[in-house]
Regions:
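Short, low-complexity, intrinsically disordered N-terminal peptides in bacterial proteins
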Residues: 1-19, 150, 157, 162-163, ...
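N-terminal subdomain of lithium-sensitive/metallo-dependent phosphomonoesterases centered on the IMPase/IPPase/PAP
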Residues: 1-97
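Residue-level signal for inorganic ion chemistry
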Residues: 32, 56, 67, 100, ...
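Short acidic/glycine-enriched loop/turn segments that link adjacent beta-strands
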Residues: 48, 132, 250-252
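Acidic active-site catalytic centers that drive phospho-/nucleotidyl reactions
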Residues: 56, 79, 95-98, 102, ...
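DPxDG-like acidic metal-binding loop motif
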Residues: 86-147, 171
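Short helix-loop capping/hinge motifs at secondary-structure junctions, enriched
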Residues: 143-146, 150-152, 262-265
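An extended, acidic
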Residues: 157-277
């Protein structure tokens, strides 16, 4: 198939779900990168840092078309508007370009991500960072991998990393500056942020979560994540042996990932920022 001037691969419906997810994020990411190299303009969504490009739309259109051909009974939900009601009870959740602000400005810290979920939980996740050629995959019965190599960071003699305190880890996070003016958000965020050894705010939640799974980042937290920003990485962190959790504080939902102890301590820190009685 051709999208604009760019050719994309027609995928084989016989691929299993993991193979299909890997191929989809790889092709979507490469398509977006080629379009950026050819020149792009952006449109603002909710803020100056929340933007969308033609590459976001084209990559999502590619994934949508391939899924409708390869998995016609499954539902589809995409960040840029894709919405298909399936009959199988399963739904593919698409983020064609996660980290669009980074993507548009020439950073390598962006990715294409996808998850497959059913009514009970996320089944698998795949994240591809094209400019660093990193593909994280895992979930369900499939242990987490990075470029096909097993991730064992949480499995050291029963999970030594799972017992490491958040104070010994760098934490990845994201918060829009406007939220810092709201005590209902700022207080729990500050409590969690100051509990970590260091902070990293790099601009792509899925890239962050892949690095939690492979050990480059110790833990991660963020509020109000849509499914396409959360489910791919959640599946991979859990498949790597890590922990994930959510907690509601001051009316906001917070999302966490990392080792068991770090996630437990992040949750306690966030809850300590509650201003409700």
């Amino acid at each position: 198939m051709t999208i604009g001037r760019h050719s994309a691969v027609e995928l084989d419906p016989a691929l299993d779900d993991y193979q299909l997810a890997s191929a989809l994020v790889r092709e979507a990411g490469q398509l977006a990168l080629l379009m950026r190299m050819a020149g792009l303009q952006s449109q603002q969504k909710t803020s100056v840092s929340d933007i969308v490009t033609a590459a976001d739309h084209a990559a999502e259109a590619y994934v949508l078309e391939q899924l409708q051909r390869c998995r016609p009974e499954d539902g589809i939900l995409g960040e840029e508007g894709a919405s298909v009601q399936g009959s199988s009870g399963r739904t593919w959740v698409i983020d064609p370009v996660d980290g669009t602000y980074n993507f548009l400005h020439g950073s390598t810290y962006w990715c294409s991500a996808i998850a497959l979920k059913d009514s009970s939980d996320v089944l698998l996740g795949a994240i591809f960072q094209p400019e660093e050629d990193k593909l994280w995959l895992g979930g369900g019965s499939r242990p987490a991998t990075l470029n096909g190599q097993a991730l064992a960071v949480f499995h050291d003699n029963g999970g030594a990393r799972n017992s490491t305190a958040v104070a010994e880890f760098g934490a990845a996070t994201y918060i829009h500056p406007s939220w810092l003016a709201d005590p209902l958000c700022a207080m729990p965020w500050h409590a969690a942020a100051t509990s970590a050894a260091a902070l990293r705010m790099l601009g792509s939640g899925s890239c962050d979560l892949g690095r939690v799974a492979d050990g480059q980042l110790g833990c991660w937290f963020q509020h109000s994540c849509p499914e396409w920003d959360w489910l791919p990485g959640k599946a991979i962190v859990r498949a790597a042996g890590g922990a994930t959790d959510t907690v509601r504080v001051n009316g906001l939902e917070w999302f966490m990932a990392g080792g068991t102890t770090a996630v437990r301590e992040l949750r306690a820190a966030l809850e300590s920022g509650s201003v409700t009685t």
